[in-house]
């Protein structure tokens, strides 16, 4: 295999990282909705923590995207 095909295989693996970030964010917000349904008085605190968690999960997806762009253009 040449280096170009290996670059594209690496980019495909980076897509798995983006998929994982999307799954993580969806799990965070589905858990948030069920937690708010169980305890509406704690909604403000739960929402703040969920947004922090979603930001961290989305950062992993952005890191995967940046690495994929570095692989494409290097």
Curated annotation (Swiss-Prot):
<keyword id="KW-0066">ATP synthesis</keyword>
<comment type="similarity">
    <text>Belongs to the ATPase C chain family.</text>
</comment>
<keyword id="KW-0472">Membrane</keyword>
<feature type="transmembrane region" description="Helical">
    <location>
        <begin position="8"/>
        <end position="28"/>
    </location>
</feature>
<dbReference type="GO" id="GO:0045259">
    <property type="term" value="C:proton-transporting ATP synthase complex"/>
</dbReference>
<feature type="transmembrane region" description="Helical">
    <location>
        <begin position="52"/>
        <end position="72"/>
    </location>
</feature>
<dbReference type="InterPro" id="IPR020537">
    <property type="entry name" value="ATP_synth_F0_csu_DDCD_BS"/>
</dbReference>
<protein>
    <recommendedName>
        <fullName>ATP synthase subunit c</fullName>
    </recommendedName>
</protein>
<keyword id="KW-0997">Cell inner membrane</keyword>
<comment type="subunit">
    <text>F-type ATPases have 2 components, F(1) - the catalytic core - and F(0) - the membrane proton channel. F(1) has five subunits: alpha(3), beta(3), gamma(1), delta(1), epsilon(1). F(0) has three main subunits: a(1), b(2) and c(10-14). The alpha and beta chains form an alternating ring which encloses part of the gamma chain. F(1) is attached to F(0) by a central stalk formed by the gamma and epsilon chains, while a peripheral stalk is formed by the delta and b chains.</text>
</comment>
<keyword id="KW-0406">Ion transport</keyword>
<feature type="site" description="Reversibly protonated during proton transport">
    <location>
        <position position="58"/>
    </location>
</feature>
<keyword id="KW-1003">Cell membrane</keyword>
<keyword id="KW-0813">Transport</keyword>
<keyword id="KW-0375">Hydrogen ion transport</keyword>
<keyword id="KW-0812">Transmembrane</keyword>
<dbReference type="InterPro" id="IPR035921">
    <property type="entry name" value="F/V-ATP_Csub_sf"/>
</dbReference>
<keyword id="KW-1133">Transmembrane helix</keyword>
<dbReference type="Pfam" id="PF00137">
    <property type="entry name" value="ATP-synt_C"/>
</dbReference>
<comment type="function">
    <text>F(1)F(0) ATP synthase produces ATP from ADP in the presence of a proton or sodium gradient. F-type ATPases consist of two structural domains, F(1) containing the extramembraneous catalytic core and F(0) containing the membrane proton channel, linked together by a central stalk and a peripheral stalk. During catalysis, ATP synthesis in the catalytic domain of F(1) is coupled via a rotary mechanism of the central stalk subunits to proton translocation.</text>
</comment>
<comment type="function">
    <text>Key component of the F(0) channel; it plays a direct role in translocation across the membrane. A homomeric c-ring of between 10-14 subunits forms the central stalk rotor element with the F(1) delta and epsilon subunits.</text>
</comment>
<dbReference type="InterPro" id="IPR002379">
    <property type="entry name" value="ATPase_proteolipid_c-like_dom"/>
</dbReference>
<dbReference type="InterPro" id="IPR000454">
    <property type="entry name" value="ATP_synth_F0_csu"/>
</dbReference>
<dbReference type="GO" id="GO:0008289">
    <property type="term" value="F:lipid binding"/>
</dbReference>
<dbReference type="GO" id="GO:0046933">
    <property type="term" value="F:proton-transporting ATP synthase activity, rotational mechanism"/>
</dbReference>
<dbReference type="GO" id="GO:0005886">
    <property type="term" value="C:plasma membrane"/>
</dbReference>
<dbReference type="GO" id="GO:0033177">
    <property type="term" value="C:proton-transporting two-sector ATPase complex, proton-transporting domain"/>
</dbReference>
<dbReference type="InterPro" id="IPR038662">
    <property type="entry name" value="ATP_synth_F0_csu_sf"/>
</dbReference>
<keyword id="KW-0138">CF(0)</keyword>
<keyword id="KW-0446">Lipid-binding</keyword>
């Amino acid at each position: 295999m040449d280096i170009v095909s290996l670059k594209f295989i690496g980019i495909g693996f980076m897509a798995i990282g983006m998929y994982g970030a999307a799954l993580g964010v969806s799990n965070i917000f589905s858990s948030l909705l069920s937690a708010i349904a169980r305890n509406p008085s704690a909604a403000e605190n739960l929402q703040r923590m969920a947004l922090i968690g979603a930001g961290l999960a989305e950062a992993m997806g952005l890191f995967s995207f940046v690495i994929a762009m570095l692989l494409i253009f290097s």
